Amino acid sequence: MAVSRITRWRLMSVIFGIKCLFLMVTLGVLLINSFTIQNIQSTPSPTTTVEFQEVSECCVCLDKWVGHQCNCYFISKEEKSWKRSRDFCASQNSSLLQPQSRNELSFMNFSQTFFWIGMHYSEKRNAWLWEDGTVPSKDLFPEFSVIRPEHCIVYSPSKSVSAESCENKNRYICKKLPI
């Protein structure tokens, strides 16, 4: 009788151990699948950005931002004053566009719209300045040297710049590094 009790307990222990092993393997498979699904869902898809985004190997931009040459651009559809445009860009952890070269905007088709960029005239320094306080390179827009206090710069469809009152309302372009 004692032998049959021991045999029963052994048999139940073996069955219980096999069930535990099966449950641990199942749990491991579920955890691996869960992490794989989370990684896929958290990776932004190139189709979540605006329709004319160029796919770049090093750009991952938020929805409604355009990726180009490892930068992200927000091209507004609404019009605001220069200051309100600057404030909007700042709220998005970006700044009004400060182009590094004339070619930087060549990938966009501007049609007939003017866009604020990050340049304004500082009466205090008697110079055109970027939003960050630096002086623009003379090579960037050599044709532009107009002195107009209380004016800011718009980028035009003809791929040139002009000065307008900062209170005028225009569309705007924000720029930031990719996520």
From Swiss-Prot:
Gene Ontology CC terms: external side of plasma membrane; plasma membrane; receptor complex
Q: What does this protein do?
A: Immune receptor involved in self-nonself discrimination. In complex with KLRC1 or KLRC2 on cytotoxic and regulatory lymphocyte subsets, recognizes non-classical major histocompatibility (MHC) class Ib molecule MHC-E loaded with self-peptides derived from the signal sequence of classical MHC class Ia and non-classical MHC class Ib molecules. Enables cytotoxic cells to monitor the expression of MHC class I molecules in healthy cells and to tolerate self. Primarily functions as a ligand binding subunit as it lacks the capacity to signal. KLRD1-KLRC1 acts as an immune inhibitory receptor. Key inhibitory receptor on natural killer (NK) cells that regulates their activation and effector functions. Dominantly counteracts T cell receptor signaling on a subset of memory/effector CD8-positive T cells as part of an antigen-driven response to avoid autoimmunity. On intraepithelial CD8-positive gamma-delta regulatory T cells triggers TGFB1 secretion, which in turn limits the cytotoxic programming of intraepithelial CD8-positive alpha-beta T cells, distinguishing harmless from pathogenic antigens.
Q: What is this protein called?
A: Natural killer cells antigen CD94
On whether Coiled coil is a keyword of this UniProt record, the answer is no
Q: What is its main location?
A: membrane
In terms of Pfam families, this protein maps to: Lectin_C
What residue stretch is flagged as signal peptide?
Answer: none
Disulfide bond entries: C58-C70, C61-C72, C89-C174, C152-C166
Where are the membrane-spanning stretches?
A: 11-31
Q: What InterPro entries does the database record attribute to this sequence?
A: C-type_lectin-like, C-type_lectin-like/link_sf, CTDL_fold, NKG2/CD94_NK_receptors, NKR-like_CTLD
Please report the organism this UniProt entry assigns to the protein.
Mus musculus
Say which domain of life the source belongs to: Eukaryota
Q: Which loops or segments lie on the Cytoplasmic side of the membrane, by the record?
A: 1-10
